[in-house]
Amino acid sequence: MKKYEIMYILRPNLDSKDVKKINDTLQNVFLQAPNQILEQNEIGLKDLAYLIDNHKKGYYNWLMVKADNDAVLEFNRIVKITEEIIRFIFIKDKE
């Protein structure tokens, strides 16, 4: 299993229930054994450095996880089909 750092940004026009639902869906991928969430931070609504899909703000979320390849593939699949996610980055840690 490898360690990954993940950051994703949600559309700013979502209400808190929708933000929580999406966060829970994405985090559940890493809550199934043997995967685990090491750290998480729901940063909240922040200004974007530049417009993304005509949005000036977005809900930022950050995760540090240990995951196998299947979890990484499932996370990427979910992110790509979820329209509320306007940007994401998935980085493998050096460990």
From Swiss-Prot:
GO molecular function term, any single one: small ribosomal subunit rRNA binding
Alphabetical keyword list: Ribonucleoprotein, Ribosomal protein, RNA-binding, rRNA-binding
Domain of life of the source: Bacteria
Gene Ontology cellular-component annotations: cytoplasm; ribonucleoprotein complex; ribosome
Keyword rRNA-binding (UniProt): yes
Any one Gene Ontology BP term: translation
InterPro entries linked: Ribosomal_bS6 (IPR000529), Ribosomal_bS6_sf (IPR035980), Ribosomal_S6_plastid/chlpt (IPR020814), Transl_elong_EF1B/ribsomal_bS6 (IPR014717)
Family: Belongs to the bacterial ribosomal protein bS6 family.
PANTHER family: MITOCHONDRIAL 28S RIBOSOMAL PROTEIN S6 (PTHR21011), SMALL RIBOSOMAL SUBUNIT PROTEIN BS6M (PTHR21011:SF1)
Annotated function: Binds together with bS18 to 16S ribosomal RNA.
Protein name: Small ribosomal subunit protein bS6
Species of origin: Onion yellows phytoplasma (strain OY-M)
Lineage per the UniProt record: Bacteria, Bacillati, Mycoplasmatota, Mollicutes, Acholeplasmatales
Gene designation per UniProt: rpsF
